[in-house]
Amino acid sequence: MTRTPVGSARTRPKPRKLGPQRGKALQASSRLSESPALVKKRMPDACTLGRAGIGLPKMCLHMAVRHSKAQKTGPGILQQRQKPPAPRASGGPALLGKRRGCSEAGSASLEPLSSSRAAAGCLNQVPLSPFLAGPRNTRRLPAPERERIELAATLCLEGWPLRCLASKGKLHCVY
């Protein structure tokens, strides 16, 4: 078996010809190796988009607010994200819910769960049903229909925790 010398035609890779797509591929690879400063110059800023009247999607809004806070510009974007202060007057379940930390009636929020929201009963999580996991009756005895009461959901409606119980195919909700 003969060895080929280093740098011969057999060991060198042949350049591929991609045709018309070669230019696009070269542009994409050069963009990947660009410095972040060049990318920042090419991409429009969230503040310039806000001044131009271009609406930002809600997913991008929190990044735009963080960026504009760092630059201390873009008051229009900051005003969109500010929440109105919660009323301090007592009375009514809606005011109580706002003061306790429930965001909106019956809505789950994306904010991290705080202890005040947990104390208000606004967990917005449906507990796991024992009937979905499978029967726990290992002795094969039929379970009476009256005992099949499960806690279906705990909702935060206007600040009051609402418990819904499912029994005999009907849903009963109590405060």
UniProtKB/Swiss-Prot annotation:
Domain of life: Eukaryota
This protein's name: FOXL2 neighbor protein
Species, as recorded: Homo sapiens
Location of region: Disordered: 1-39, 70-100
Cellular component, GO, one term: fibrillar center
